[in-house]
């Protein structure tokens, strides 16, 4: 959280807003919620957050409703402007009576919440139960896509593009498994034998066959045929990794030592995919933080001022911390970066608090140095006085 105005009061309010966000994140376990929501988003193609005020516990509540029950209306061709959102979900009769003081006719009830920026409507089994002005002044839902299709509101899942390759890989693996199973239970072949009975294939078995007959076991692996199946499976693996933009090296499949730049080039498809997703998520998390601060200002009377919210992402690849620190040190010394910006880039969670600690340590060290210098000055003066007195006595 960065203050828009350049004043001590504005910076204090920005620090207060950042601390409030950290508390809400901790109260709602948002790190775990974000992980679960991201998995749902990758599978379903879309995800949703709901930010409301919990009147019972008097705090901000952040949840992730099932996006399959979310319906949205947007303005014309501008898919970023939602003017109405409906949330549909089912509750048991006991839950319905506990939450809404209404007893449904059946064992379950269908609840529909209809939100606009001005109004809120609640339906229970298609019957209007409550209608009132929106207490928040905004729609408390944030709907976002996994990967957005051009000019469409709803996104696409990561699964359809890899499903065909995965099915073919499963078929090839099953075929190879059957071949290996048959080779482990070989088939006995008897030539020039008109009839046979009680022929068992086991260690030490003795077969009595005519003089001109021949017996042998059918080897399904001879001639290198099994290698064709293995090569085809490797080809499917490569296709699967290429389509999903996740190179094999992302799973620790590097069998040679390479430099950091070479690793970054090899993982570039995955980095581009992560970057596309982060662009979408940055807007979502920023909007969620804005909703949290608005609810705290409305219901707790807080005043956070006018601030600029930023999302700081961690590095995807392992970083050379020593090199990064040296680069930031040079940027700070040349006046290009401030100390707080350098801390942000390195990954310090709370740069403002860390900067305060640095100032306190610096002030303590300077005070100790002054005290030591003062003591050494007094000691030197005493030694000089003692020497002067000794010289006077000798004379």
PLM regions: where:
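Short low-polarity hydrophobic stretches
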Residues: 49, 166-169, 342
């Amino acid at each position: 959280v960065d203050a828009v105005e350049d004043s001590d009061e504005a910076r204090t309010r920005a620090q207060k807003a950042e601390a409030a966000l950290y508390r809400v994140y901790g109260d709602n376990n948002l790190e775990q919620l974000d992980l679960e929501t991201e998995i749902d988003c990758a599978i379903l193609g879309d995800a949703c957050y709901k930010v409301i005020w919990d009147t019972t516990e008097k705090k901000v509540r952040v949840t992730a409703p099932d996006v399959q029950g979310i319906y949205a209306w947007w303005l014309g061709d501008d898919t970023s402007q939602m003017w109405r959102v409906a949330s549909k979900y089912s509750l048991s009769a006991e839950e319905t009576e506990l939450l809404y003081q209404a007893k449904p006719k059946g064992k379950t009830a269908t609840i529909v919440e209809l939100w606009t920026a001005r109004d809120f409507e609640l339906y229970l089994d298609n019957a209007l139960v409550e209608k009132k002005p929106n207490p928040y002044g905004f729609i408390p839902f944030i709907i976002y896509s996994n990967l957005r299709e051009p000019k469409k509101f709803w996104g696409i899942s990561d699964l359809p593009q890899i499903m065909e390759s995965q099915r073919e890989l499963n078929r090839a693996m099953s075929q190879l498994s059957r071949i290996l199973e048959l080779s482990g239970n070989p088939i006995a072949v008897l030539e020039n034998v008109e009839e046979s009975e009680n022929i068992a294939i086991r260690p030490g078995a003795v077969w009595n066959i005519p003089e001109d007959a021949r017996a042998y076991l059918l080897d399904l692996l001879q001639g290198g045929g099994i290698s064709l199946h293995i090569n085809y499976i490797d080809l499917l693996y490569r296709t699967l990794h290429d389509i999903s933009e996740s190179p094999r090296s992302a799973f620790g499949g590097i069998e040679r030592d390479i430099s950091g730049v070479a690793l970054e080039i090899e993982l570039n498809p995955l980095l581009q995919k992560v970057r596309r997703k982060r662009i979408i998520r940055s807007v979502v998390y920023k909007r969620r933080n804005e909703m949290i601060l608005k609810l705290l200002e409305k219901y707790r009377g807080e005043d956070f001022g006018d601030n600029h919210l930023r999302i700081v992402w961690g590095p995807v690849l392992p970083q050379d911390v020593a090199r990064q620190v040296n680069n930031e040190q040079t940027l700070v010394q040349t006046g290009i970066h401030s100390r707080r910006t350098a801390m942000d880039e390195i990954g310090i969670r709370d740069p403002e608090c860390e900067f305060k600690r640095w100032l306190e340590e610096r002030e303590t060290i300077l005070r100790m140095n002054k005290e030591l210098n003062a003591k050494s000055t007094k000691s030197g003066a005493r030694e000089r006085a003692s020497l002067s007195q000794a010289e006077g006595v000798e004379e």
